[in-house]
Structures are given as C-alpha cells and as structure tokens.
C-alpha cells in the first residue's frame, strides 16, 4: 500500500476517534421531516459532574416537550405505592419468603448495621435492595441527576413534561417480581463481584460522560449476569415497550426530547439500536 494512502487512512481514523470522543449520550432521530432527540441519563450524579455535556442543552432548546421514564407528577404517587408494596402485610415476614441461608446472612449483615431484625424483616427483598442502593449512601444525589436538571429547565421554560411509563407501570416493575426474583435482586448486592466493584456508579458516570452508552448497558447487564431474567425485566422488556410510544412522539408533529437511563440506550437491545433497526436515521451528537 502506498505510504500516502496509509497516512490518509490513519488521518481519517484519528478524525473518527476525535469525533467519537466528543460525543455525548444524546442522539438526533429523524424520519422524513420529523425529528426527535434521545438523551441517556445517569439518575444520580455528583456536583463535579456539572456542567452537563452541551448536547443536552442543545437538544432541550430544540425540543417542544420533555419525556422522562416516569411523569414527575406521577413519581410521588409511584414512590408511595412502591413503599407500601415493599412491606409485608402484618403477620408476614421476610423469613417466610427467602432461603433460610439468605435470611441468616441478612440477619448478620443488619446486625452489623445495628438494624433490629424486626425492622428489616418487614420489607420484601427487592425493597431492601433499593434501600441499600440509595445514591446518598454512595456519595451521589438524585437531585443532581440528568432528569432533575432537565425537569427544572422545563418548568422554568414552561415546557410540558410527561413519562414513558405511568406511575402504576413503573411500580409494577418491582411489584410483579416473584419471590425468587426478589431474593435474587437482593443477593446481587452481596456477590463478591458486586462488593469488589463498589465504584460501578462512578464507572457508569465516566462512560456516560464520554458518550459511551454501550459500556453503561454492559455494566448493568453484567450485574444481572447471574440472574438474566432481571436484566430482561428492568432493561430489555421496558425498551421494547417504549418503542411504539417513542415512534408516536416522532410522528406527532412536535419535537420531543426523550430521556431515560443511559443503560437503556446502548447495546443491541437498546433504544438506539431498536429505532435504527426500524429504519430511522440516528446521529449521535
């Protein structure tokens, strides 16, 4: 191969790398003259993660409406429903729904945390898992998450905000878990790989910052590798359910900015790939 062509190929590759390095987890979707924007979110961030990549503000400014995973007005209702459903009815206990070895292990863990058995045993395993994953326990804040930032901007600019899921649909993601799935969700917190990878939140934030939704999806799916049905439930199934709604937004005549967790955007079963597979043109910003 002549040296000049080799140099041209290397130069083109470098340009591609530089362009990719400057990308954000924001995509422009077009279908004919219709336009929609997708934004990958990290639900909880740190103050040093600001300012957000400029593409988020550009997509917001170009849009008429903002769509999050759940309508913010319904989120409080959903949270109340999840809190209520996360507790067993009076007379029932966690002990009756998990393997005895799991219960004994949890009893030791919560004893170290100085939590009485009567307190933690009131809750279903999936709810205990949510409690242990609370961002505030890991130095992050949901009030600094991407959605919260954009919701505040939407309110300040009188832009309508809606959700891909209703309060009930969002709550049902957890409420319809079987005892086995619920126990698996909690056990994930105590697997050696999970304990060793305590910085996964930071790793996901770094991938999101450089526009690498595929890595965010991989991290999430790796967490579910021992319990693949949970990965299907929390990511893949919801992605597929959202596609008809997103296509409806795209054909509505209005410009929507649809924001969901970055892990929903990447991978072969992510929103970006699913829309591209249906013939829509997608450009990462």
Q: Where do the PLM segments sit?
A:
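Bacterial N-terminal signal peptides that target proteins for export
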Residues: 1-10
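Short hydrophobic "helix-edge" motifs at membrane interfaces and signal-peptide entry regions
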Residues: 8, 30-32, 251-252
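N-terminal signal peptide c-region/cleavage motif recognized by signal peptidases
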Residues: 18-20
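Structured, acidic catalytic/metal-binding patches in enzyme active sites
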Residues: 22-234
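A cross-kingdom marker for long, charged
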Residues: 229-285
């Amino acid at each position: 191969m002549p040296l000049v062509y080799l140099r041209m190929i290397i130069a083109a590759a470098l340009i591609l790398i530089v362009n990719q390095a400057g990308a954000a987890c924001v995509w422009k979707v077009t279908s004919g003259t219709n336009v929609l924007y997708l934004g990958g979110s990290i639900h909880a961030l740190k103050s040093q993660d600001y300012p957000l990549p400029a593409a988020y503000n550009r997509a917001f400014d170009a849009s008429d409406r903002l769509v999050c995973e759940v309508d913010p007005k319904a989120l409080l209702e959903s949270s109340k429903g999840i809190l209520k459903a996360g507790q067993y009815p009076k007379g029932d206990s966690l002990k009756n729904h998990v393997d005895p070895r799991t219960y004994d292990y949890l009893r030791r863990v919560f004893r170290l945390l100085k939590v009485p058995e009567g307190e933690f045993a009131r809750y279903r395993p999936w709810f205990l898992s949510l409690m242990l994953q609370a961002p505030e326990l890991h130095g992050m804040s949901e009030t600094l998450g991407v959605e919260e930032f954009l919701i505040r901007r939407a309110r300040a600019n009188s832009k309508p905000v809606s959700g891909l899921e209703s309060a009930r649909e969002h709550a049902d993601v957890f409420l319809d878990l079987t005892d086995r799935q619920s126990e698996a969700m909690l056990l994930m917190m105590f697997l050696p790989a999970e304990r060793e990878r305590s910085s996964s939140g930071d790793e996901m934030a770094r991938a999101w910052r450089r526009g690498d939704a595929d890595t965010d999806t991989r991290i999430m799916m790796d967490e579910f590798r021992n319990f693949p049905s949970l990965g299907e439930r929390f990511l893949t199934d919801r992605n597929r359910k959202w596609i008809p709604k997103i296509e409806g937004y795209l054909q509505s005549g209005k410009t929507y900015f649809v924001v969901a967790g970055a892990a929903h955007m990447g991978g072969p079963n992510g929103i970006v790939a699913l829309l591209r597979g249906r013939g829509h043109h997608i450009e990462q910003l």
